[in-house]
Regions:
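N-terminal subdomain of nucleotide-sugar transferases
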Residues: 1-69, 177
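A short, histidine- and acid-enriched strand-loop-helix "catalytic/donor-clamping" loop
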Residues: 12-14, 94, 113, 127-149, ...
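Catalytic cores of nucleotide-enabled group-transfer and carboxylate-activating enzymes in metabolic
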Residues: 39, 130, 143, 165, ...
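A short, charged, and often flexible helix/loop element on the N-terminal side
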Residues: 60-91, 146-150
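An aromatic- and histidine-rich active-site surface loop
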Residues: 81-89, 102-125, 131-140
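Glycine-rich phosphate-binding loop signature in dinucleotide/nucleotide-binding domains
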Residues: 96-102
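Membrane-proximal helix-turn-helix segments that form the acceptor-binding/catalytic region
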Residues: 113-116, 120-124, 137, 152-172
């Protein structure tokens, strides 16, 4: 059986939208000859309310690796768990890829910044990776036209980082066709 590493900062007991896509992929991949290894952030670092009933839906014996994240600060400077756990996710992903026979890395986004782990792993190990767009990364936020605003910076940063994330991707999928055109 081939092995796939799924890097998803949120996973049950989180109940965010991206969680369900990763959860269902991981549930059905074994039927197609793929053994999923989930890499996520420990739920102690989630900001959302946890749903332990959702956790009960996970297949018995599913391998889930958890990392820590930097806590949310007051004032809230960085909320995105993909940023708060980026270094920890990247380090653990590299360990898994180097020490196990990982055939593919699947990265559902958001969290958008986690997609940058794909090219890093590719450069370090040659492992192929794919990015699954649940939401578009580059889009205009309300207020993006206001120069030097938070949304202006976010839009510019997304336009600069996204090409770096997808440059060596072997696969790009999306919920809507426009995401990957």
């Amino acid at each position: 059986m081939k092995k796939i590493l799924i890097i998803t900062p949120h996973y049950p007991p989180s109940n965010l939208a991206a969680v369900h896509r990763s959860r269902l992929f991981a549930q059905h991949l074994p039927a197609f000859g793929w053994e999923p290894v989930l890499l996520t952030v420990h739920e102690d670092f989630y900001e959302e309310q946890l749903d332990w009933n959702l956790h009960k839906l996970l297949p018995a014996g599913q391998r889930i690796e958890k990392v820590r994240a930097y806590p949310v600060t007051k004032p809230r400077l960085i909320g995105d768990i993909g940023l708060r756990a980026f270094l920890q996710l990247r380090k653990r992903a590299l360990e898994i890829v180097q020490n196990e026979q990982i055939d593919f890395v699947y990265i559902p986004i958001p969290s958008f910044y986690v997609s940058l782990i794909g090219p890093y792993l590719y450069r370090k190990t040659g492992v192929k990776y794919g990015i699954d767009y649940i939401d578009p990364w580059v889009h205009v936020f309300p207020g993006s036209e206001k120069i030097l605003s938070r949304h202006w910076f976010s839009t510019r940063l997304a336009k600069w980082l996204e090409p770096k994330a997808i440059k060596h991707a072997s696969l790009i999928t999306g919920v809507a066709e426009g995401y990957y055109k």
